[in-house]
């Protein structure tokens, strides 16, 4: 076995920071799959990524020439030779197709018989020829939305590819990938005058990059260095940094030669700009780390840490430049706040008349009026809310969209409204709801923390869904430009997690009527929206690891209360030893299905001849008595426990009682007993999906 180190580095123009990690992981995983498919052995693979390079280093790669053996199977011996041992036509034709004489064929015995075979030995394609093909294939497989073409090529990738390095130890693999010839030099840091770094051996990577210009090619190493340096610098001003994984990932993806530097801003900004807006400006807009006081208050300090992409002797100038940019951003925020505060939040309401919500769905002012009516109609689902506060939150919900702050910082919609509402002495619950109406804004995001926030968020999303479905702007498998899937899932998460007993059918019908559409069939649109919600529910439970059978058994019942659905799914999933109940349900279903002639709906005691059927009726009555209140309270776990208690009398009934009695009335009476039990099951789920 000949072991060597292989290196491939794809040099590109600046890659998008938000997908850098995803790109290299896809590149790595697909390469591992290709090695496995081609049965190529190796010790391990290291992967590297910076804004301008993607690289893989394969350690102890087996490069020895191997021979692949293929067996071409011919006819069975009994068909290949006649009784006298002479070859048949089938054998001759097979040998001809293999381009051999029959005397070159071998025999192979298997469990199924004996066959003639031909062994074909082929040399495996050399690594030098195979790997360039694999690399180009994988790069084409990286399916991301925003790919581009460059120069005269029709090939597509996320960013133009400018350099390819392919080394097998010290040997350059001469080939092309995406029409770019391979070589043995890496591109320097973007700020370096010396363009090229020559690499002698694949094993030198990534040390050669760090030695030449402190480039840290390993993503995780770079991230840890940034985190360590930021914490170290914060201590110099008696501060700490809070963990912000999104910011850390973004900054790591933006630099390849990181250096953390400390800068400051005026303390006046802390006193005037609300804390969350200040943090948003520093972290989200400027991609810097905020510093907090190292005490229980965790107040923000007038400093920030930024990550430079270069080691420089001119750090003072770099710091000064970043301070000027930060001052400009914070100064803008202060100016916009001053301008916005000249009006009360509620005084922005009339200006919403000039802002369109969406074509054929009116203005934001009209949406506000719809929210007011809708939220009032669903206030009955919770008793802990002040109705006036609920309506007030709807009225003020969109007012901050007109402000200069939201115009400049659109990501802060809702948050700005909350601060202005608090400054205007609105109730705290109203202010928080204004902020929380947009939650959850992405998968796994936090949910509204207050009852008013929950209902406002649900109302806002239901209004959008109803309107978009009514005008035909529904999601497709490829596109969902209005985030309707996310909105529906957000509604379901709030309802289920916060245990709000909302009936989707009712609030969708109310929402559609509030719109007052002309030439719209509300019934059809409502059914489409419900179907859409059910598909999202199925996705929700599948993602959480619930059994597909259990999900289908409940969703097939055409229920429209997500909380009720959740209780049923959890009851069936949690109950131990439910298999015996499922078997009973199956047996009853099969018997009832094969007997269609049920005329009467009443059970007649006088027709009962056997003790077992009388006992079963008695147990059914006890069950009805015990579960009447449980069904009202939707305590399905307790109901299933009670159903399990029917198991023994049902078994006795099946063992001792002949259901298909010759007397029609007796037969019908016995079937009615089973139908009663069948209805108990159907009041929880369709158990036919479980067996």
Swiss-Prot record:
UniProt EC number:
6.1.1.14
Which top EC class is given? ligase
Per the record, its GO cellular-component terms are: cytosol
The Gene Ontology biological process annotation of the record reads: arginyl-tRNA aminoacylation; glycyl-tRNA aminoacylation
Q: What is its main location?
A: cytoplasm
Q: Which UniProt keywords apply?
A: Aminoacyl-tRNA synthetase, ATP-binding, Cytoplasm, Ligase, Nucleotide-binding, Protein biosynthesis
What are the subcellular locations of this protein? Cytoplasm
Matching InterPro entries: DALR_anticod-bd, Gly-tRNA-synth_bsu, Gly-tRNA-synth_heterodimer
Signal sequence span per UniProt?
Answer: none
A molecular function (GO) held by this record is: glycine-tRNA ligase activity
Say if the entry is tagged with keyword Secreted: no
Q: Name one Pfam family in it.
A: DALR_1
Q: State the reactions this protein catalyses.
A: tRNA(Gly) + glycine + ATP = glycyl-tRNA(Gly) + AMP + diphosphate
Please name the HAMAP family in this protein's record.
Gly_tRNA_synth_beta
User: What is the similarity comment for this entry?
Assistant: Belongs to the class-II aminoacyl-tRNA synthetase family.
What subunit structure does UniProt give? Tetramer of two alpha and two beta subunits.
Record-linked NCBIfam families? glyS
Question: What is the protein's name according to its record?
Answer: Glycine--tRNA ligase beta subunit
Native organism taxonomy: Bacteria, Pseudomonadati, Pseudomonadota, Gammaproteobacteria, Enterobacterales
């Amino acid at each position: 076995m000949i072991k060597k180190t292989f290196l491939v580095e794809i040099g590109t123009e600046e890659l998008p920071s938000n997908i850098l990690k995803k790109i290299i992981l896809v590149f790595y995983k697909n390469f591992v799959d290709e090695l496995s498919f081609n049965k190529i052995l190796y010790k391990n693979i290291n992967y590297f990524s910076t804004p301008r390079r993607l690289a893989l280093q394969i350690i102890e790669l087996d490069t020895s020439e191997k021979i692949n053996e293929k067996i071409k199977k011919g006819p069975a011996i009994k068909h290949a030779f006649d009784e006298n041992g002479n070859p048949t036509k089938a054998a001759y034709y097979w040998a001809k197709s293999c381009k051999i004489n029959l005397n070159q064929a071998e025999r192979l015995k298997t469990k199924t018989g004996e066959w003639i075979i031909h062994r074909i030995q082929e040399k495996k394609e050399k690594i030098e020829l195979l790997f360039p093909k694999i690399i180009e294939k994988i790069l084409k497989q990286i399916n991301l939305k925003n790919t581009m073409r460059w120069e005269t090529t029709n090939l597509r990738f996320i960013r133009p590819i400018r350099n390819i390095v392919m080394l097998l130890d010290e040997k350059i693999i001469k080939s092309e990938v995406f029409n770019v010839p391979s070589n043995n030099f890496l591109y320097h840091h973007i700020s370096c005058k010396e363009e090229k770094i020559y690499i002698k051996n694949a094993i030198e990577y990534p040390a050669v990059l760090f030695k030449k210009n402190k480039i840290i090619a390993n993503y995780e190493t770079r991230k840890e260095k940034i985190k360590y340096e930021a914490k170290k610098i914060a201590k110099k001003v008696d501060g700490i940094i809070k963990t912000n994984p999104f910011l850390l990932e973004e900054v790591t993806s933006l630099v390849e030669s990181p250096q953390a530097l400390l800068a400051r801003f005026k303390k006046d900004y802390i006193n005037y700009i609300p804390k969350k807006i200040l943090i948003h400006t520093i972290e989200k807009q400027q991609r810097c780390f905020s510093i907090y006081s190292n005490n229980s208050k965790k107040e923000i300090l007038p400093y920030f840490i930024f990550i430079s992409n270069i080691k420089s002797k001119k750090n003072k100038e770099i710091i000064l430049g970043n301070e000027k940019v930060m001052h400009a951003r914070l100064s803008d925020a202060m100016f916009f706040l001053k301008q916005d505060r000249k009006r009360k939040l509620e005084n922005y309401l009339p200006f919403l008349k000039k802002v369109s919500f969406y074509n054929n769905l009116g203005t934001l002012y009209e949406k506000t009026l719809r929210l007011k009516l809708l939220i009032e109609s669903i206030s009955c689902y919770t008793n802990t809310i002040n109705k006036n506060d609920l309506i007030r939150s709807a009225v003020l919900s969109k007012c901050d969209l007109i402000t200069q702050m939201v115009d400049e910082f659109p990501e802060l919609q809702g948050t700005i409204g909350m601060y202005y509402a608090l400054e205007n002495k609105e109730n705290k619950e109203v202010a928080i709801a204004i902020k929380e109406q947009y939650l959850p804004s992405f998968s796994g995001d936090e949910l509204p923390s207050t009852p008013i926030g929950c209902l406002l968020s649900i109302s806002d999303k239901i209004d959008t869904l109803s309107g978009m479905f009514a005008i035909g702007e529904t999601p497709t498998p490829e596109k969902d430009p209005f985030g309707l899937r996310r909105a529906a899932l957000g509604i379901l998460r709030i309802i289920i997690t916060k245990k709000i007993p909302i009936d989707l059918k009712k609030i969708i019908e109310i929402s559609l009527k509030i719109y007052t559409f002309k030439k719209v069939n509300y019934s059809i649109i409502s059914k489409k929206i419900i179907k859409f919600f059910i598909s999202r529910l199925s996705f929700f439970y599948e993602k959480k690891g619930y059994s597909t059978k259990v999900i289908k058994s409940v969703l097939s019942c055409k229920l429209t209360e997500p909380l009720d659905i959740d209780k049923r799914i959890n009851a069936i999933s949690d109950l131990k030893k439910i298999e015996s109940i499922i078997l009973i349900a199956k047996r009853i279903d099969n018997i009832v299905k094969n007997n269609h002639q049920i005329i009467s709906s009443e059970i007649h005691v006088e027709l009962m001849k056997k003790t077992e059927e009388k006992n079963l009726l008695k147990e059914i009555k006890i069950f009805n008595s015990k579960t009447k209140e449980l069904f009202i309270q939707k305590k399905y776990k307790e109901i299933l426990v009670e159903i399990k208690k029917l198991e023994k009398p049902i078994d006795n009934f099946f063992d001792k009682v002949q259901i298909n009695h010759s007397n029609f009335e007796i037969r019908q009476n016995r079937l009615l007993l089973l139908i009663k039990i069948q209805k108990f099951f159907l009041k929880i789920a369709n158990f036919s999906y479980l067996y």
